[in-house]
Amino acid sequence: MRKTILLILLLTGSAIASLAQTLPVTGTFINLPYQDVRNKYTNPEGIDGTDPQMWAAKVSEMKEMGMEYLVFMSVANECKAYYPSKLMNWHYPEDRQSPVDAIMEEAARHGMKVFMSTGWAKDQDDNLRDPAIKGRQIEMMEELAGLYGDHPAFYGWYLPVEDCFGPVLTDYAVEAVNALTARARELTPHAKIMISPYGIFNSDFNDPRYEQQIARLTVDIIAYQDEIGCVREKYPLPRLRENWKKLRAIHDKTGIQMWANCESFAWERGTNDRQSALIPAPFPRFLSQMAAATEGGAEKIISFIICGMFDKPGSQYPMGQPYWSEKAYEDYMAWLGGDAYWKAAEEYFLSAEVPMEKVTDAAWIKYKAGKHEMEVEPCDGQLTVAMLNCNKRGIVPPVKVSLYGKAKGRWTLVETVEPQKWANTNHDAFVDQAIFRGIPAGLKKMKVTFTVEKESYIYIIGK
């Protein structure tokens, strides 16, 4: 099949210069207890999750990644504490430093800021409608304030009240958050207070009560879960971009900081299943999430979760999915360091004029199985072939893409690029890219050739 088209989009230098700089991830949750199979890689059973030396090393590695904020998901589980509690028994050997103390100490050494959790009173299913659970969380807060309120790394409180914001936050959720907040302000007046709710995918932004309920909250920061890892919709990223902007408009009126909690994980088996392990998402998906949060007006980006999804190669304490957690680390650090490939991908995700992660976007050009070539408008700088990767629908990028140029009557191969291959693609839709740089000047014609194995969606950009 032969298809001849002109370039869909030419990005000029001025257009590229106007693109925002994507916010990096500057905070992450710390996950201490092994609760279920979801934590297979974030807190492996084969590693002592209470080892203070291990946590000191991991905090140092996270600092190298640019983390400024550490958020304890919980500091107790099943009525055992990960800190020297007098309220409950300890979840670590009594003859050594607690994991909470080790993390706080290393965080202080690196100038990092820690949000202390008030959970769990019992376990990950704490129900604040139960007076005993609510009372124990307040008792824990009081004890933790006495132990760490003056610690140089203590920055504030994370309230593990992950109520659903959609379609509208309930009165009970508002009251539960505000009750904990009131006690936190009495104990630690200068501490920042943060929640990280879910449910923006089905939030009713048109209901005036939605904004009113947010305005009633007395917290300092709402770090919304972007729910891309949880895959609450078939194609969640395009609508997320609009929802961030709607939330930004609300937060401009409330004075509450709007942070993004960009989920870095995919699922080894089924989604949202406690018997399915969290695994690293392909980096193009995660980069698109960061770009969406930036463009939508988030003030900071944190992530559930860095430790276990990203792992430094050669770490003294290896953690995460073999190979893929190290690759996630290398890809993120390459982007952070200004790698040309990932910066080009970032430009794509920040552009409003290109197709995104949805098969129904009319800008995609669909190709069936077979060999294809398309003639494109010549350009002297960079040519990007964007490709939708939606394995769950049988839509995958070509195995390789070749660029040919014609200057003096003959087609000459310029370069062949093999798109990166990803393993953890069972549930997501994201955009991959093949990027050609150093295109020879003076080409009269250019064409791209590729072979499609199943079905491919392609879009071409030049600059």
Placement of each model-derived feature along the sequence:
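Boundary/entry segment of secreted carbohydrate-active catalytic domains
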Residues: 21-68, 73-76, 199
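Aromatic-lined substrate-binding rim segments of carbohydrate-active enzymes
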Residues: 52-121, 172-193, 237-242, 246
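An active-site-proximal structural segment forming one wall of the substrate-binding cleft
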Residues: 94-110, 128-156, 213, 293
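Aromatic-lined carbohydrate-recognition surfaces of secreted/lumenal glycan-active proteins
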Residues: 115-127, 131, 158-162, 178-207, ...
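Active-site groove signature of glycoside hydrolases
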Residues: 119-125, 140-171, 302
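Aromatic- and acid-rich polysaccharide-binding/catalytic face
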Residues: 152-165, 198, 207-238
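Substrate-binding cleft of secreted/luminal carbohydrate-active enzymes
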Residues: 226-233, 256-342
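Aromatic, loop-rich ligand-recognition surfaces of beta-strand-rich domains
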Residues: 360-415, 430-463
